[in-house]
Amino acid sequence: SGGVRSTRDEEGDDMVPTHMFLTRGVGVHKEKLAAFEQALRSAGVAYCNLVSVSSILPPHCKILPRKRGEKFLNPGEITFCVMARSETNERNRLISASIGLAIPTDRDTYGYLSEHHAYGETDEESGEYTEDLAAQMLATTQGIEFDPDVAWKEREQVFKMGGKIVRTLNITQSAVGRPNRWTCVIALAVFIPTENIPKSLLNKA
């Protein structure tokens, strides 16, 4: 985006991500760590050295489709992400992992990402929870008054009618545990290193 505000470190490398993508995965294996590896492969990020960061969506950061975003990652590079992870080795136990986003109307300001992992929650339940959580965090920085005790769908309308939150969304993965196997689910928001983004994409309005 031509309006991106850059923050650079001493070497001049851009440390504020301009692009990201959402992904999810599930893995099943008799070994816990191998199940996690399978989930990373399912999510398309097993070849990166992932570093978990906290919950800020940078100003002007664009969300790319997963298939497009994956093309800008290189094997072995340090890749920042917000990750939710859940695992079980219990038969028939429902697990879920979810990432929620809340995007402000004013893209000069930052948004929020939230992560959540749970037992016994469906995709829809976990997804609504993370969207709600991200929206609440953003609402508190925007001075939006809301009732934390009403249902998310009602609160969602209040947030969006206020004009300061333009969009909320989530990506969620759930699975049911299998006997004698570890099952792992993950959901991620992956920040693409800015030096990997073509200039033509960076300059696009």
Regions found by a protein language model. Give the residues of each.
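Helix-coil modules at protein/domain termini and other flexible surface or pore-lining loops
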Residues: R5-A205
